[in-house]
Amino acid sequence: MNVRRALADTSVFIGIEATRFDPDRFAGYEWGVSVVTLGELRLGVLQASGPEAAARRLSTYQLAQRFEPLGIDEAVSEAWALLVSKLRAAKLRVPINDSWIAATAVAHGIAILTQDNDYAAMPDVEVITI
């Protein structure tokens, strides 16, 4: 089987947590995870409404930690600046964290695996919507 690399965004982990889909569906992918996604998931643990929600979110955060973390380095920051420049020129606004996740994918030459439409308008970003 040919394995394809992809960067799973925060929505994918939230979808797994909410059991909207089975993670085995993505057996053909080698997942990476942005440090931005890790931060968003950790924030979810810290801001959970109660102990049950916190435990569920912690489990999701720990799942995400099992995948290759992709950090923000000079290549990612360059990709981010170019991406945001193009978006601003087109008068498009996207969530700031999503722009960093997209830049991470672009810098590493991999697609983003997502449930969101936030990446649809982003130039040069390969998106796999689930």
UniProtKB/Swiss-Prot annotation:
Co-factor requirement? Mg(2+)
Per UniProt, what does mutating T114A do?
Does not inhibit growth, forms complex with VapB4
At the top level of its lineage, which domain of life is listed? Answer: Bacteria
Localization in the cell: Secreted
Please report a single Pfam family linked to this protein: PIN
Q: Provide the binding site for Mg(2+).
A: D9, D98
According to the record, mutating D98A results in: Does not inhibit growth, forms complex with VapB4
* Gene Ontology, cellular component aspect: extracellular region
**MF-aspect GO terms:** magnesium ion binding; RNA binding; RNA endonuclease activity; toxin sequestering activity
Q: Which UniProt keywords apply?
A: Hydrolase, Magnesium, Metal-binding, Nuclease, RNA-binding, Secreted, Toxin-antitoxin system
Q: Which CDD domains match?
A: PIN_MtVapC4-C5-like
The UniProt entry's GO biological process terms, in alphabetical order, are: symbiont-mediated perturbation of host process
Outline the extent of the PINc domain. 7-130
What InterPro entries does the record tag this protein with? PIN-like_dom_sf, PIN_dom, Type_II_TA_system_RNase, VapC_family
EC number(s) on record?
3.1.-.-
The record gives the effect of mutating D9A as: Does not inhibit growth, forms complex with VapB4
Q: Which family is annotated?
A: Belongs to the PINc/VapC protein family.
Please give the PANTHER family that the UniProt record associates with this protein.
RIBONUCLEASE VAPC2
Q: Please name the HAMAP family in this protein's record.
A: VapC_Nob1
Q: How does it assemble?
A: Interacts with cognate antitoxin VapB4.
Q: What does this protein do?
A: Toxic component of a type II toxin-antitoxin (TA) system. Probably exerts its toxic effect by binding to mRNA, inhibiting translation. Binds to, recognizes and cleaves ssRNA at ACGC and AC(A/U)GC sequences, usually between the G and C; cleavage is not very efficient, nor is cleavage required to inhibit protein synthesis. Upon expression in situ, in M.smegmatis or E.coli inhibits cell growth and colony formation; in at least E.coli also causes increased levels of cellular RNA. Its toxic effect is neutralized by coexpression with cognate antitoxin VapB4.
**Full protein name:** Ribonuclease VapC4
